[in-house]
Amino acid sequence: MLYIEKERKLPVNDKYDIIVVGSGPSGMGAALSAGMMGAKVLLIESQGSVGGISTSGLMSHFTGHVRSNLYQEVLRRAALHNTFKRGLKTVTIDPEMLRITYYECLKLANVDLRLYTMVCDTIVENNKVKGVICESKSGREAFFAKVVIDCSGDGDVAYKAGAEYYMGREEDGKMQPATLMFKVGGVDYERAIFPPSFETAVQVPEGEIQALGKENLPFPAGHVLLYGSTLPGIVTVNMTNVIGIDGTNADDLTGYGHCSGVDIIGIEDEVHE
């Protein structure tokens, strides 16, 4: 069954040099860089806070070799705790402090921010994205820009503009399991074990820790991956796996949240043991 939505005129909220869609680490980098260079920038975020996975996702740390001046400035302002692992400088994340720091940086860069605002369509002229159409509590409205940068995480802007895409691996279209990070309090750091990767074999009195995980954790969880945090006694856990999830399907995402919550209970009990 199809329903034909009636045609209507939309208010044009504003025109910008650059619109960035999505306020995760990539979106923050794009918006802050453009703003600091003097561009008129709008950052659009569908959730109620900036930072994406790095904040709302309760991520444990930044990894890799990114060492830009902007990155270093964000870290300096957040006053994050620095550690060293496997020869690489790894920065532990305090999600709340990072969130506050992002807001401060956006203000300093004169970036306009719209939270709770979802991009539901694109404005395309002559095969070029000229703006976006958004839905929010303010209603449906249009924003125009010279450049639109897609940092949505799922390529939402590119998809809505008609770009070609594929999902999952080539042979069967399956995607990696969905993961929900969580934190556990009251941990004795002197006794806790922190395997640095999924593959790291660590011997404990009961046996090899990854083998124990595969044997005892609720399927499809099976690896043991724990990280220290910036707060005493708090450990970040990266061990939930929910398979068969399409990240572009609202029903799948709804079910994933419930399944991850059930997994967390079993994982916490097993890790405690």
Language-model-derived ranges and their functions:
Residues Y159-E273:
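Rossmann-like dinucleotide-binding core of oxidoreductases
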Residues E5-E7, K15, S33-K40, E45-K128, ...:
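Conserved N-terminal/central alpha/beta ligand/cofactor-binding core
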Residues D14-Y16, S138-V147:
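Core beta-strand elements of the Rossmann-like FAD/NAD(P) dinucleotide-binding domain
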Residues S136, S152, A161:
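Glycine-rich, N-terminal phosphate-binding loop of Rossmann-like dinucleotide-binding domains
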Residues I123-A142:
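Conserved beta-strand-loop-beta-strand element in the redox core of flavoprotein oxidoreductases
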Residues L10-G24:
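Beta1/beta-strand and adjacent pyrophosphate-binding region of the FAD-binding site
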